[in-house]
């Protein structure tokens, strides 16, 4: 995964995790999963509801929070290349 992808994904998922925001995760096959983000790494998201499910990121199409989320994002410095 590119560094830019991590700059967007990690703060978003971490905010959802820390604030215990309910999410709907849509998979590429159309299945909808719901719960709270328990943990995540480069390849998987642990989604907790009545049980904890390990969802591979390559199978995720969309992550929809139940409410608006403010993402702490620091833009990388602009280089004069």
Swiss-Prot record:
Per the UniProt entry, what species is this protein from, by scientific name?
Nitrosospira multiformis (strain ATCC 25196 / NCIMB 11849 / C 71)
Any one GO BP annotation for this protein: regulation of DNA-templated transcription
Q: What is this protein called?
A: RNA-binding protein Hfq
State the source organism's domain of life.
Bacteria
The protein's gene is named: hfq
Annotated Gene Ontology MF terms?
Answer: RNA binding
Q: Which UniProt keywords apply?
A: RNA-binding, Stress response
What protein family is recorded? Answer: Belongs to the Hfq family.
Q: Which InterPro entries match?
A: Hfq, LSM_dom_sf, Sm
- What taxonomic lineage is listed for the species of origin? Bacteria, Pseudomonadati, Pseudomonadota, Betaproteobacteria, Nitrosomonadales
């Amino acid at each position: 995964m590119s560094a830019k992808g991590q700059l967007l994904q990690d703060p978003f998922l971490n905010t959802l995790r820390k604030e215990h925001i309910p999410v709907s995760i849509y998979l590429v096959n159309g299945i909808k999963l719901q719960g709270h983000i328990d943990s995540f790494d480069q390849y998987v998201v642990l989604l907790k509801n009545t049980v904890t499910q390990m969802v591979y990121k390559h199978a995720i199409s969309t992550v929809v929070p139940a409410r608006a989320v403010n993402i702490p994002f620091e833009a990388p410095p602009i280089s004069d290349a």
